[in-house]
Amino acid sequence: MDKMKKPKINWLLIVIVGIIAALLITVLVLLFSPKTQPKSFDYLLKHFEEAAKSTTDDIYFETIKINSLDNTIGVIFRNGAMREEYFVAASAAQANFLTSGNVEVREILQLANVQAYIQSIKTLNGTISWFTFMNKFLAQHPGYDASKAGLFGQHIVQENGFITFIKAIWFPALIAIIIFLGYKAQSRAASGGIFNPGKNQAVIVKTDKKFTDIAGNKEPIEEVQELVDYLKNPKKYAAAGARFPKGILLGGPPGTGKTLLAKATAGEANVPFFFISASSFVELYVGLGAKRVREMFKEARKLAPAIIFIDELDAVGRSRGSGIGGGNDEREQTLNQILVEMDGINENAGILIMGATNRTDVLDPALLRPGRFDRIITVGLPDIKEREEILKLHSKGKRLSKEIKFDKIAKRTPGYSGAQLENVINEASLLSVREKTDVIISTQIDEAIDRVMAGPAKKSRVISQEELKAVAYHEAGHAVVGLKVKGGNKVQKITIIPRGNAGGYNLMTPEEEKYNASKKELLATIASYMGGRAAEMIIYGKENISTGASDDISRATKIARKMVTEWGMSALGPIKYEEDTENPFLGRDYSKGTFGSKMAHEIDLEIRKIISASEEIAIKAIEQNLELLELIKDSLLENETIVAEEIEYIEKNMKLPPNNEKIKPDGESKKVNIEDLINQVNESQEKDKQKNAQIKEDLSKMDKKDNLTKAKDKGEEETLAEKAE
């Protein structure tokens, strides 16, 4: 998002330019200033001697300045109409001699007259203080002009080194100070600063995102589009007597596009769009959050119609005075102020408040009522069709192989959010660069899916052949149960390459995506999770089962517990014993259930029954298909990774799929790729469907023929009966 108020200023660049400008000005001043010639210290003493010997006011020193920082002596010497300006690079002792003098000479001057002093020049040349001599000369010749007292127009001045340094740097320092003060003023204007901490933290943003940049989420987009249209054409809705909605809350899992939808709203609305994170309200000072809320709504009212978008609303919107930690006065004050501003005494005509959160369930009820957030829209995880659209959107501008089919990728990514799907495409792009391929190929897409789900493969991990074989049996067990138990999860991909903390990895998806599941389907799903453990028990015995089923058991137990405590699918009856409270620190009660220890024991028994029954289903399915188990295991040991099409080929033909290199009788090699294998399986399935349809049609014809025969026989019997009568 780009700030609309002010463009971003590169202060570092400005400071550098300012310093360069100051240095350039200093160089120019030095370049065009009058030039002074360097002279020796003896040359200066010679002029001192000439001035001392002169009996008129024509020879004198107009100025002598001694810089104690570098011991340079600046001199302006007058000899009649001639004016000579020069400087002397003196030593520290020479400069000190001119300003401090010689104790012996000063004593002579106190006792002798000027002539004696002049005589001393000849005998003590270079050892006297001419400054002291000037004072003595003026004291003995009061009639001389003070400005031209035979020697000096001014006293010798010893400049302070610090003052000299300040004179050299004052201009660059002034520029730097001005720039610094401007930067601090701009910072205070943006964030309130120490002198105005309660200043509005929301920024007016402008973005080029549109609703066309969002794939999936059609219902949320329609809801938001209506509000944007209201802001653009309020008269149309006013004529119908419609009230402008005050707020819209976007909820749902992380990564589903809530903030992206807000960006698109900003791009479409063409009205001031205030963006702020809820965590920006509460900071150091008491009452700061409430003040910032007031300032934000005050500015929004001035620019109405406008939209205020508060991201991560649960940071300040959680239920008041609840949870383990109790209430938080500062957060609750901020929430109270938001409630008042959204629906209080002050009117908010033309202001739409949008909020986004992952936890709508922990928000305060007063925040969710109509009149504040009139609409609560759930931006959920995309279904298979929406996943395909999202993948196509994020693939724009990327070079993809023609073999890649987005519908198959969507089928292999159930439960993925939009952010995860974008990450899949990005990971595949990075793999393409790493492997130096011109285009993104299907194997890179498969690897990207695995990386997003379970992390990168640990190919360097050393695993014994026996352990690898056990992992292959475990993963093959999942595949067999998925194929043979109706309603269970189907394995889309299996690998025995370690990922994360797991020795192997399998991707299981339901036969079709459904919003509701029957008890039979849930039991089949649990059975598919227990397929790995069942295979271990059959092959190695109950005493040699491994820890590889840890995650499977966890998932199976979670489903079984919900069947008992939430969905009423057990002998305990249709009673809800537990609430879904995974994190009590988000404003929930700590206790998950309202039942005693006896009921908890009964719940555990029912969960055990469900899992045990499902495990028996898995064991039975594998025992009846041991040959299929062995074939899938062999394929895994040979290839390390297999996909759903290869598993279906093995089930259909009860043999391993052809290798990538198949030798012809004449010795030439023929490549059989995975796409050909998939087509073979699909063609076989299509033929089976046609065959089954033909059988059904034949059976239907036979039934019709039998019915006609029966009707004919019945009619003849009725005719005979009539004749008999």
Curated annotation (Swiss-Prot):
PROSITE patterns: AAA. GO terms for molecular function: ATP binding; ATP hydrolysis activity; ATP-dependent peptidase activity; metalloendopeptidase activity; zinc ion binding. Residues 33-160 are extracellular. This is ATP-dependent zinc metalloprotease FtsH. PANTHER family: ATP-DEPENDENT ZINC METALLOPROTEASE YME1L1 (PTHR23076:SF97), METALLOPROTEASE M41 FTSH (PTHR23076). Its EC number is 3.4.24.-. In the central section; belongs to the AAA ATPase family. Homohexamer. Pfam families: AAA, AAA_lid_3, Peptidase_M41. It is found in: Cell membrane. One of its GO terms (cellular component) is plasma membrane. ATP binds at G252, P253, P254, G255, T256, G257, K258, T259. Keywords: ATP-binding, Cell membrane, Hydrolase, Membrane, Metal-binding, Metalloprotease, Nucleotide-binding, Protease, Transmembrane, Transmembrane helix, Zinc. It is an enzyme of class 3 (hydrolase). CDD domains: RecA-like_FtsH. It comes from the Bacteria. Its cofactor is Zn(2+). The active site is at E475. GO terms for biological process: protein catabolic process; proteolysis. Residues 684-725 have a biased composition (Basic and acidic residues). Zn(2+) binds at H474, H478, D552. Binds 1 zinc ion per subunit. The gene is ftsH. Acts as a processive, ATP-dependent zinc metallopeptidase for both cytoplasmic and membrane proteins. Plays a role in the quality control of integral membrane proteins. Residues 1-11, 182-725 are cytoplasmic. InterPro entries: AAA+_ATPase (IPR003593), AAA_lid_3 (IPR041569), ATPase_AAA_core (IPR003959), ATPase_AAA_CS (IPR003960), FtsH (IPR005936), P-loop_NTPase (IPR027417), Peptidase_M41 (IPR000642), Peptidase_M41-like (IPR037219). It is a multi-pass membrane protein.
